[in-house]
Curated annotation (Swiss-Prot):
It catalyses: 2,3-bis-O-(geranylgeranyl)-sn-glycerol 1-phosphate + CTP + H(+) = CDP-2,3-bis-O-(geranylgeranyl)-sn-glycerol + diphosphate. One of its GO terms (biological process) is glycerophospholipid biosynthetic process. The gene is carS. The keyword Transcription regulation does not apply. Catalyzes the formation of CDP-2,3-bis-(O-geranylgeranyl)-sn-glycerol (CDP-archaeol) from 2,3-bis-(O-geranylgeranyl)-sn-glycerol 1-phosphate (DGGGP) and CTP. This reaction is the third ether-bond-formation step in the biosynthesis of archaeal membrane lipids. It comes from the Archaea. This is CDP-archaeol synthase. The chain crosses the membrane at residues 6-26, 54-74, 90-110, 124-144, 148-168. It is found in: Cell membrane. Keywords: Cell membrane, Lipid biosynthesis, Lipid metabolism, Magnesium, Membrane, Phospholipid biosynthesis, Phospholipid metabolism, Transferase, Transmembrane, Transmembrane helix. It is a multi-pass membrane protein.
Length: 177
C-alpha cells in the first residue's frame, strides 16, 4: 500500500521535478524581472529565473506528461488510472510545470525580500518553493489526497539534501546545503 502511494506521488510530481531541473539546465539569458528593482531597492527576482529557463522548463515538464500519458495509455502503468487520458496527463503536466516555475520565481522573490543573496541557503524555501507552486497549480486540474502531498514534500526535501551532500562530497558544490 505504501509503495503504491509513494509511486503514485512521484508519478504525479515528476513533470514538476523535470520542469524545475530543466529550467536550471537550459536557463540563462534575460531574467524575467528584466533587471528591475522592487520598492525596497532590491531586485524583484534576480538573474536566476530567466525567460529561456522558464520556457524550456515548462516544455520539458509537459513533454514528461505526454510520455506518462502514453505509458498509461499502453497500460504499462495501468494501476495509475486515476489520471485519465493522454491529454489529461499533458494538461496536468503543463499545470504542474507552470506551477513549478512560478513557485521557484516566488521563492526567489521572497529570498530577495529577506535580503538572501542568490545561491545562499534558505532552508525549506529552497527545497519546497517549486513543489508548493506545482501542487497549487496541479490541484486545479487533478487534486490529490493530503497523504500524497506530505510524501511529495518529504521526499523532495530528502532528495534535495542528499543530492547536495553528494555534490559537495564530489567537489561539485562548495557547501553541503
Amino acid at each position: 500500500m505504501f509503495y503504491r502511494l509513494l509511486f503514485a506521488s512521484l508519478w504525479y510530481i515528476l513533470p514538476a521535478y523535470v520542469a524545475n531541473a530543466s529550467a536550471c539546465i537550459f536557463g540563462g539569458g534575460t531574467p524575467v524581472d528584466l533587471g528591475k528593482n522592487f520598492i525596497d531597492g532590491r531586485r524583484l527576482i534576480g538573474n536566476g529565473v530567466t525567460y529561456r529557463g522558464c520556457i524550456f522548463g515548462i516544455l520539458c515538464g509537459t513533454l514528461v506528461g505526454l510520455i506518462q500519458g502514453i505509458l498509461v495509455d499502453f497500460n504499462i502503468f495501468n494501476s495509475l488510472d486515476f489520471y485519465g487520458t493522454v491529454l489529461d496527463h499533458v494538461i496536468l503536466a503543463f499545470f504542474l510545470s507552470v506551477g513549478a516555475i512560478v513557485g521557484d520565481a516566488v521563492g526567489s522573490f521572497i529570498k530577495r525580500r529577506l535580503n538572501i543573496e542568490r545561491g545562499k541557503p534558505a532552508p525549506l524555501l529552497d527545497q519546497l518553493d517549486f513543489v508548493i507552486g506545482a501542487l497549487a497549480f496541479g490541484y486545479i486540474v487533478a487534486p490529490i489526497p493530503y497523504e500524497m502531498i506530505i510524501i511529495i514534500c518529504l521526499f523532495t526535501v530528502f532528495v534535495h539534501l542528499l543530492g547536495n551532500i553528494i555534490a559537495y562530497k564530489l567537489g561539485i558544490k562548495d557547501v553541503w546545503w
